[in-house]
Amino acid sequence: MSTAASSRMRVFSGRSTRTYPRAVPTYHCQPCRRVPSRPCRPVRALDTASKHARSNRATAAQKEKQGHGGSAQGARNPASHRHLHQRTRGDQVPSEPPSRPRKDHASQSPDTAY
């Protein structure tokens, strides 16, 4: 009988632990309760992000139409600047290895040393 009682106690303990996770969804909205002014953070975050994205795109399009590039030109210049750097690096890299004495010494040292 003691084994049956212990098994029953285990079942009850299992049920009691299972009831807590079932009650968790009611408390699952803790991030929302942390900020009472925002009852539902994810939805508002998505809404505000979409609103900001739309407003930024609209203003950028208007600026481009008006001829005032503003941030649009600032975004284009660094990209072209990077491409210029990559081109100059590509031009400089082939000219650097022959000018470096490392490869010459490396190729001559085995012949002279051995």
Swiss-Prot record:
Composition bias type Low complexity, residue spans: 32-43
Superkingdom: Viruses
Keywords assigned by UniProt, alphabetized: Early protein
Region: Disordered, residue numbers: 1-114
Full protein name: Uncharacterized 12.6 kDa early protein
Organism field: Human adenovirus B serotype 7 (HAdV-7)
